[in-house]
Amino acid sequence: MSDFFELTNRGTRSYAAGKKFGVLDSRNGLMAISEGFRPIKDRYDLVVEHVADINFSPIDHNAGYEALYASERKCDCFLHTNSRRTLVFVEIKHKYTSADLDSAELNDFLDQHRDVTKESVAADEWIDDVIDQLESTITRFKTLNPTELTYYPCVNWAVGANSRIRDGVEFSIANKQDDFYLRTQFELLIRNHISIPSDPPPSNPVHLSLDELKSLIS
């Protein structure tokens, strides 16, 4: 995974070097996205492997422990929410050269890999909600100018631990005073359905105002 992005937050680079996975850190409510992450030049579809509630102690909750856990799970990478409890495991399943997969194809793709969630009923239900949300969200994102989206793989609406997303009601957002990061792991999938420059500039992620964010998800 270090072939795709480096991790610099709180010394995670030393843990990520040479590994096949990466740790996306949101312990302070924000992903480590300002520096150290390389833009993904190829398009990858990430599939949720498992959602698990794990009680990290302040000592255990560090990049090394998380990287070890991801390694044991044989995950390519994982995200966790600011709640410090729910981990959303994702696995790189496919690389697509086409940005035109429709929601039905994506649905079929996820269904093919749904067996990885059978150990968790909650995860299986959560996948259903992901599919439902994607079907409506992909259409919206196709209408956006690609420059309005960040090019970083870790930018996302916070999902996973949020019960609202499991109920398919609304997206969660991460509050940073008056600014909001467009934060959703859906973007990791959605980016395969829109036109994105093949070599995006290594700039800071896009910041959106609350009104701008609401306009995107309303």
Describe these PLM feature segments:
Residues 70-80, 130:
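Catalytic centers of nucleases
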Residues 156-218:
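Short, low-complexity, polybasic intrinsically disordered segments
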Residues 69, 95-99, 163-167:
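Short acidic, S/G/P-rich loop/turn micro-motifs used as interaction or catalytic elements
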Residues 121-128, 138-173:
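Nucleic-acid nuclease catalytic cores
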Residues 77-79, 86-95:
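Conserved catalytic cores of phosphodiester-cleaving nucleases, focusing on short active-site segments
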Residues 94-124:
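A solvent-exposed, charged loop/short amphipathic helix patch at secondary-structure junctions
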Residues 1-72:
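Basic, amphipathic N-terminal segments that precede the first structured/catalytic domain
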Residues 72, 85-87, 126:
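Negatively charged, Asp/Glu-rich surface segments that serve as flexible interaction/assembly modules
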